[in-house]
Amino acid sequence: MSDNGDNNTKSPQHNNPQPNEKSDGKVQPGQPQVNPQRKFTAGINKKKEKLNEDLSELDKLRQQLIHFQNQFRLAVADKENVKRIMQKNIDDTSIYAISNFARDLLSSCDNLETSLKNLKEGDSIHAGVLMTYKELLNTLERHNITRIDPIGEKFNPQFHKAVSQMVDAEKDDNTILHVVQPGYIIKDKLLRAASVIISKKSD
């Protein structure tokens, strides 16, 4: 009986660790060893590569932004240029149309001026002609047409037409002494040159 009891008694089982299992956190035989320094360096290198990729992409985006900004500026500049050209064409057309009409009025201005010189000041007719003359000049000025009366100025062939010369030792050469016929400009364009007599020092 005792033998059976002995036979039925089981010897204690021990859970021995397998060759590749960790029992105390240490690397067991047969498991590849990892170098912590190498692992850290690899991680840093990987982050550097990712950073370089991000910087490269950022640089591309920056270049694209500069390109689009330049394109936008060119588009705005082109638009402004077209606008200026169109406005200039409108102004030139307007000036051309007014110029033809204004030239017809200049002869009326000249006739009124001549009449004023020949009429006695204070006469009722003189007053009426003077009022008409002033109204005509005001009408011209409202359309940016200005009278040129350059006595004492230096002769400028762009706006003046010399019809004669007079000796005047006290004046510099080409000083305007008399205005035979006044000129007119419309904005910055010549409508009619002023006919003038200019000075010279001697014959």
Curated annotation (Swiss-Prot):
It is found in: Cytoplasm. Coiled coil: none annotated. Residues 1-46 are annotated as: Disordered. GO terms for molecular function: adenyl-nucleotide exchange factor activity; protein homodimerization activity; protein-folding chaperone binding; unfolded protein binding. Residues 1-20 have a biased composition (Polar residues). The keyword Cytoplasm applies. Gene3D superfamilies: 3.90.20.20, Head domain of nucleotide exchange factor GrpE. Homodimer. Participates actively in the response to hyperosmotic and heat shock by preventing the aggregation of stress-denatured proteins, in association with DnaK and GrpE. It is the nucleotide exchange factor for DnaK and may function as a thermosensor. Unfolded proteins bind initially to DnaJ; upon interaction with the DnaJ-bound protein, DnaK hydrolyzes its bound ATP, resulting in the formation of a stable complex. GrpE releases ADP from DnaK; ATP binding to DnaK triggers the release of the substrate protein, thus completing the reaction cycle. This is Protein GrpE. It comes from Ehrlichia chaffeensis (strain ATCC CRL-10679 / Arkansas).
